[in-house]
Protein backbone atom coordinates (compact mmCIF):
# COMPACT_ATOMS: atom_id res chain seq x y z
CA UNK A 1 0.00 0.00 0.00
CA UNK A 2 1.41 3.40 -0.96
CA UNK A 3 0.88 6.07 1.65
CA UNK A 4 -0.48 9.51 0.75
CA UNK A 5 2.59 10.86 2.55
CA UNK A 6 4.70 10.02 -0.49
CA UNK A 7 2.85 12.76 -2.36
CA UNK A 8 4.17 15.50 -0.08
CA UNK A 9 6.48 17.96 -1.80
CA UNK A 10 9.55 19.40 -0.16
CA UNK A 11 10.55 22.93 -1.17
CA UNK A 12 14.15 23.50 -0.10
CA UNK A 13 14.05 27.15 -1.19
CA UNK A 14 11.46 28.28 1.36
CA UNK A 15 11.54 25.37 3.83
CA UNK A 16 7.98 24.16 3.30
CA UNK A 17 6.24 20.89 2.47
CA UNK A 18 3.18 21.14 0.30
CA UNK A 19 -0.02 19.40 1.34
CA UNK A 20 0.88 18.54 4.95
CA UNK A 21 -0.21 20.13 8.24
CA UNK A 22 2.14 22.80 9.60
CA UNK A 23 2.39 23.76 13.26
CA UNK A 24 3.62 27.26 14.09
CA UNK A 25 4.97 28.30 17.47
CA UNK A 26 5.23 31.93 18.49
CA UNK A 27 7.11 33.60 21.34
CA UNK A 28 4.00 33.59 23.53
CA UNK A 29 3.67 29.82 23.10
CA UNK A 30 7.02 29.20 24.82
CA UNK A 31 6.23 30.72 28.21
CA UNK A 32 8.32 28.90 30.80
CA UNK A 33 10.85 27.59 28.27
CA UNK A 34 13.38 30.40 28.55
CA UNK A 35 15.61 30.63 31.64
CA UNK A 36 15.14 34.41 31.84
CA UNK A 37 11.38 34.83 32.24
CA UNK A 38 11.72 38.61 32.61
CA UNK A 39 13.48 38.80 29.23
CA UNK A 40 10.67 36.68 27.74
CA UNK A 41 8.00 39.00 29.15
CA UNK A 42 9.90 42.06 27.91
CA UNK A 43 10.30 40.56 24.43
CA UNK A 44 6.54 39.92 24.29
CA UNK A 45 5.89 43.65 24.82
CA UNK A 46 7.64 44.21 21.47
CA UNK A 47 5.55 41.63 19.62
CA UNK A 48 4.85 37.92 19.28
CA UNK A 49 7.20 36.74 16.51
CA UNK A 50 7.20 33.31 14.92
CA UNK A 51 9.98 31.23 16.53
CA UNK A 52 9.63 28.03 14.51
CA UNK A 53 7.35 25.97 12.30
CA UNK A 54 7.13 22.22 11.71
CA UNK A 55 5.47 20.57 8.72
CA UNK A 56 4.72 16.93 9.62
CA UNK A 57 3.86 13.89 7.56
CA UNK A 58 1.99 11.21 9.50
CA UNK A 59 3.12 7.71 8.65
CA UNK A 60 1.05 4.58 8.40
CA UNK A 61 0.63 2.75 11.71
CA UNK A 62 2.83 -0.17 12.70
CA UNK A 63 6.42 -1.15 13.26
CA UNK A 64 8.98 0.22 10.85
CA UNK A 65 6.89 3.14 9.61
CA UNK A 66 8.66 6.45 9.18
CA UNK A 67 7.25 9.71 10.52
CA UNK A 68 9.09 12.73 9.14
CA UNK A 69 8.83 16.46 9.14
CA UNK A 70 10.54 19.67 8.21
CA UNK A 71 11.27 22.20 10.94
CA UNK A 72 12.33 25.77 10.40
CA UNK A 73 13.85 27.70 13.31
CA UNK A 74 13.91 31.48 13.00
CA UNK A 75 16.91 33.59 14.01
CA UNK A 76 16.59 35.71 17.13
CA UNK A 77 17.12 35.94 20.86
CA UNK A 78 15.20 36.34 24.07
CA UNK A 79 17.65 38.06 26.37
CA UNK A 80 20.87 36.07 26.00
CA UNK A 81 19.16 32.87 24.76
CA UNK A 82 18.61 32.05 21.12
CA UNK A 83 15.17 31.09 19.85
CA UNK A 84 14.43 27.43 20.52
CA UNK A 85 11.75 24.82 20.06
CA UNK A 86 9.52 23.63 22.87
CA UNK A 87 10.88 20.10 22.46
CA UNK A 88 9.06 16.82 22.82
CA UNK A 89 9.30 13.37 24.37
CA UNK A 90 8.98 10.04 22.61
CA UNK A 91 6.50 7.51 24.00
CA UNK A 92 8.86 4.83 22.69
CA UNK A 93 12.23 5.91 24.10
CA UNK A 94 14.24 3.87 21.57
CA UNK A 95 12.78 5.85 18.65
CA UNK A 96 15.42 7.23 16.32
CA UNK A 97 15.50 10.89 15.37
CA UNK A 98 17.70 12.57 12.76
CA UNK A 99 18.31 16.28 12.26
CA UNK A 100 19.86 17.68 9.09
CA UNK A 101 20.68 21.36 8.62
CA UNK A 102 19.63 22.50 5.17
CA UNK A 103 20.64 26.15 5.26
CA UNK A 104 22.06 28.76 7.60
CA UNK A 105 24.34 28.49 10.60
CA UNK A 106 23.63 27.38 14.13
CA UNK A 107 23.84 24.67 16.75
CA UNK A 108 21.40 22.00 17.85
CA UNK A 109 21.43 21.21 21.56
CA UNK A 110 19.62 17.93 22.13
CA UNK A 111 18.64 16.45 25.48
CA UNK A 112 18.27 12.74 26.15
Question: Which residues does each predicted region cover?
Answer:
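Eukaryotic intrinsically disordered, low-complexity regions enriched in proline/serine/threonine/glycine
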Residues: 1-33
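Active-site region of the double-stranded beta-helix
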Residues: 21-112
Amino acid sequence: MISAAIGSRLNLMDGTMEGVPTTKRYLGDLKGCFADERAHALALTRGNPLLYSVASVESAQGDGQLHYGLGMLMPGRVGREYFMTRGHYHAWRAAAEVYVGLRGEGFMLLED
